[in-house]
């Protein structure tokens, strides 16, 4: 019986709670752990697109997502002197169509966690050792506790500690696409009203948006650089690098950076893809960015997480808990979808951060039209199996 199959899910981002939801719905017994003290508030804006929209509706959370969406009404391109070059309707500016929705990462995770309120979840917990044999997986926690599970599913992000413990370095690749991304919340000092501003020039891009939280604004930075940080996880090194990279950029950039110390949700990372021939090893599976991050610029990581969660849990149900059969199908079914979205991620990375002094209306419209067409294609480039 599947209800006796105990599954540890590592990570409370999008993929972790999503796969826990489907595991419980399909009759398994998942438990969640998360190294942070609580669900992180705010964060980057994420899109629910294509097939992922259908999955959100099946989960009964789509209406809640719509109620908490960002509601950006207008997007404006500005030059480094602050002159408005042109503007677009909010959904077009964000490359969204039909019933696709944008929501802050923290709000989406909060919705997902409410949907799995009956599933045990332990915060401030992490794994320091994983051992497996033919019968089970033995997990040693940082507090010294040792537990046995039938399966482990790791959804602990692009810098997955689980991936490093379970897979050898020749079994995965971190492919740096040559750019960096940063985001953090600051006071809405410009008084933006459901608006996003974007300034792009000389391989760099700065955005500022404010939506339903009128007193706050989300700042975003993307830029190309060949410089490699000594420690990509060192926040002080990240902030120094960001300051140095944008010190002469113009527009509102210095005003935004001067407010960076006020932020409590600073995010910074290299724009990277994860590539693996197999996302499973024995009784352990990777999911979401830990397995197949398509790059933050693609806007597709959220959708890969939703689809991957549904298929992994569904194949375990279909195989009646036979993890070897289920994991094989998970790899087979999802790889073409992942490859299409990762190829799109590379293309987006190359089409943004232009060397031009400014992005003309013609360039922006041509790029927008191509992105809309490509997103619609890659977001729906899989036929979802039915498991119920």
Curated annotation (Swiss-Prot):
InterPro entries: FAD-bd, FAD/NAD-bd_sf, FAD_aromatic-hydroxylase
Cofactor comment text: Binds 1 FAD per subunit; it is seen bound in two conformations.
Keyword set, alphabetical order: Antibiotic resistance, FAD, Flavoprotein, NADP, Nucleotide-binding, Oxidoreductase
Keyword S-adenosyl-L-methionine applies: no
SUPFAM superfamilies linked to this entry: FAD/NAD(P)-binding domain
Residues that bind FAD: 12-15, 34-36, 44-47, 105, 267, 289, 296-302
EC numbers: 1.14.13.-
Activity regulation comment: Inhibited by anhydrotetracycline.
Note: Isolated from a grassland soil sample.
Entry's family note: Belongs to the aromatic-ring hydroxylase family.
Primary role: An FAD-requiring monooxygenase active on tetracycline antibiotic and some of its derivatives, which leads to their inactivation. Expression in E.coli confers high resistance to tetracycline and oxytetracycline, does not confer resistance to minocycline or tigecycline. Degrades tetracycline and oxytetracycline; the reaction requires NADPH. Degrades and confers resistance to chlortetracycline.
PANTHER family given in the database record: MONOOXYGENASE (PTHR46865:SF2), OXIDOREDUCTASE-RELATED (PTHR46865)
Protein name: Flavin-dependent monooxygenase
Organism: Unknown prokaryotic organism
């Amino acid at each position: 019986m599947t209800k006796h199959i105990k599954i540890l899910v590592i990570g409370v981002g999008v993929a972790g709670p999503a796969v826990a939801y489907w595991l419980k719905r399909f009759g398994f017994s998942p438990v969640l752990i998360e190294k942070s003290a609580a669900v992180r508030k705010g964060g980057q804006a994420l899109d629910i697109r294509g097939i992922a929209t259908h999955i959100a509706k099946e989960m009964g959370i789509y209406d809640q997502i719509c109620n908490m969406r960002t509601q950006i009404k207008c997007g404006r391109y500005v030059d480094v002197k602050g002159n408005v070059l042109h503007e677009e309707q909010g959904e077009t500016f964000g490359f969204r169509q039909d019933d696709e929705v944008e929501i802050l990462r923290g709000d989406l995770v909060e919705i997902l966690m409410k949907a799995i309120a009956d599933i045990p979840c332990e915060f401030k917990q992490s794994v320091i050792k994983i051992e497996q044999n033919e019968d089970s997986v033995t997990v040693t926690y940082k507090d010294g506790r040792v537990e046995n599970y039938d399966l482990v599913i790791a959804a602990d992000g692009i810098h997955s500690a689980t991936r490093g413990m379970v897979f050898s370095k020749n079994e995965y690749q971190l492919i740096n696409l040559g750019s960096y991304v940063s985001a953090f919340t600051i006071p809405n000092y410009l008084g933006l009203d459901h608006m996003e501003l974007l300034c792009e020039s000389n391989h760099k891009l700065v955005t500022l948006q404010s939506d339903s939280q009128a007193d706050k604004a989300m700042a975003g930075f993307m830029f190309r650089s060949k410089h490699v940080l000594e420690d990509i996880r060192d926040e002080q090194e990240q902030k120094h690098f960001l300051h140095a990279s944008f010190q002469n950029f113009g527009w509102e950039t210095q005003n935004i950076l001067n407010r960076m110390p006020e932020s409590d949700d600073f995010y910074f990372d290299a724009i990277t893809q994860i590539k693996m021939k197999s996302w499973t090893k024995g009784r352990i599976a990777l999911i979401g960015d830990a397995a197949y991050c398509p790059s933050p610029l693609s806007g597709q990581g959220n959708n890969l997480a939703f689809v991957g969660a549904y298929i992994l849990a569904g194949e375990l149900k279909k195989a009646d808990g036979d993890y070897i059969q289920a994991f094989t199908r998970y790899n087979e079914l999802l790889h073409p979808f992942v490859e299409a979205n990762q190829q799109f991620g590379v293309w987006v990375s190359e089409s943004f951060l232009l060397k031009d002094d400014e992005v003309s209306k013609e360039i922006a419209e041509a790029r927008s039209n191509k992105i809309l067409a490509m997103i619609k294609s890659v977001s729906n480039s899989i036929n979802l199996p039915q498991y119920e």
